[in-house]
Every structure is written in structure tokens, then in C-alpha cells.
Amino acid sequence: MGKKKLALTKKNLKQSIIEAENWILLSGIQNSSKKYFGSVNAWYDPKKKKYSFIYSEINGYFLTLMVYLYKRSKNKLYLKRAISSAKWLIKNTQKKNGGFSCLTVIDKHSSHNFKKDLIYSF
């Protein structure tokens, strides 16, 4: 038996977009804690039930998406989320040479800790 194909309609496309927007805003992927406020989490460890680190690159994708959604919808919540992510990046990860720290460690036992001193320069 073959897989049933989902017919793409305007209705289910709109619903999928709404669900994706709700997830990005309500999932907790963007930090609300004082220490990491505005940053976007990277990998979630289901065994430890916590995020391992904050990845600067993902923050860049996130704030770009938030600006796009703001421009499309004029919903100021998207702009507010983008600004909080940008402020966190600049304050916590930007280096004097203009680059950004690769990641910020949350779980000190993460296997990704070796990247904490690397810098993105793009």
C-alpha cells in the first residue's frame, strides 16, 4: 500500500502556517528567563529534559523570520521577539572583531562545549 498524498489547498496551507507561527511563538524555544531572555534554544535533550546550549546561528534565523512575519502581518509581537533576540546576541555573543560566539553553554556537560570558544565571522 502506498502512502496517501495530502492535497495542498489554500485552506490547509493557511492552517499549517498558523500552526507553525503558533509553535514558534508558544513552544518555549525562545527564552523568557532573565539570564537568557530573548535568545533561542538549540538542541533539546529529552533524557535530561533541558536544552544544551543557545546557538547564535539559530538566533539569526529566528530574528530574520520574526522580521519577515512582522513585515507580512504588521503584528508587533514578531518585531518585539526579533528585537529581543538581536539584543541578546549583541550583548552576550558579539565579539570586538564583529563576529559572534558559536554557542552559549547551558548544560556544562553537553558534548558541544568544545564549540564555546569558536567565533562565527559571517
Segments and roles (model prediction):
Residues 1-122:
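Glycan-recognition and catalytic cores of secretory/periplasmic carbohydrate-active enzymes
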